[in-house]
Amino acid sequence: MPEQRLRIAIQKKGRLSEDTVKLLKACGVKVNLNTQRLIAHSDNMAIDILRVRDDDIPGLIMDGVVDLGFIGQNVLEEENMMRTVAKEPTAHKVVKELAFGACRFSIAVDQDFDYQGAKSLANLRIATTYVHILKRFMEEQNIPYTSCMLTGSVEVAPRAGLADAICDLVSTGATLEANGLKEVEVIYRSTAVLIQRADPLNQQKQDLVNRLLTRIDGVQSAKECKYIMLHAPTANLEAIKSLLPGSEQPTVMQLSGSSDHVALHVVSKENLFWETMEQLKTLGASSILVLPIEKMME
């Protein structure tokens, strides 16, 4: 029955969309998203994927139209503030912070601008898509300004004479530099999150959500971990174990045909640097392998 299928909203295009699709596939959700269809159905789970504009996702969650949504915190925060002003529903639950979509929301000015702190922004005209987040910051700083609402290409506003400064998302800063701007004030930091509608789901849907969250945990944990395998002389076993970074107690196995060497296997949440590998080698370790982990369940 359609009402028993979990409805998940994702951004229809862009980097966040690509990362979300990769995550869903890594979680074992089989769905064909290669076509331009706005709704896609999973082949192996009771899940429907709705591809929509990113700024529509919070509203779909808050209005109870969909069950889950993958969204940037910046978009969620802006929509939440806008709906609060309009006295529209804002209830939702953030159920998982995700390991992608990290960016910052910053004010940028012309590279020649003599910036002496936030007070230098007084009485400037600032172009932005996120008027409410900007407004909150400027009011907290007690700085008068004029807002210029733009829905795209915010970075060209100063050159076009539309604004004195901008407030926009920044990942690397390359776009700002290309447009003769410099970042002067970070006012908000964002990452991707998974949000859920506030009203309770039926048991079948909630069970599916719980399964999905467990798989997301497994995928994200696996990305942060490495599987380390090596052969070690028993005479230096404790010294070698002490060099393995951030690990639980390793699995130690006797090597076939050898009484003075063992195999060590361990999952590490820290990188094994070349210097450490060289130290291990000095202690007699051999066949040292550091492997990525695709999936993990603790």
Swiss-Prot record:
Its main location: cytoplasm. GO terms for molecular function: ATP binding; ATP phosphoribosyltransferase activity; magnesium ion binding. Its cofactor is Mg(2+). Pathway: Amino-acid biosynthesis; L-histidine biosynthesis; L-histidine from 5-phospho-alpha-D-ribose 1-diphosphate: step 1/9. The keyword Glycosyltransferase applies. Feedback inhibited by histidine. It comes from the Bacteria. It catalyses: 1-(5-phospho-beta-D-ribosyl)-ATP + diphosphate = 5-phospho-alpha-D-ribose 1-diphosphate + ATP. SUPFAM superfamilies: GlnB-like, Periplasmic binding protein-like II. GO terms for cellular component: cytoplasm. InterPro entries: ATP-PRT_HisG_long, ATP_PRibTrfase_cat, ATP_PRibTrfase_CS, ATP_PRibTrfase_HisG, HisG_C, N-reg_PII-like_a/b, N-reg_PII/ATP_PRibTrfase_C. Belongs to the ATP phosphoribosyltransferase family. Long subfamily. PANTHER family: ATP PHOSPHORIBOSYLTRANSFERASE, ATP PHOSPHORIBOSYLTRANSFERASE ATP-PRTASE. Catalyzes the condensation of ATP and 5-phosphoribose 1-diphosphate to form N'-(5'-phosphoribosyl)-ATP (PR-ATP). Has a crucial role in the pathway because the rate of histidine biosynthesis seems to be controlled primarily by regulation of HisG enzymatic activity. This is ATP phosphoribosyltransferase. It comes from Psychromonas ingrahamii (strain DSM 17664 / CCUG 51855 / 37).
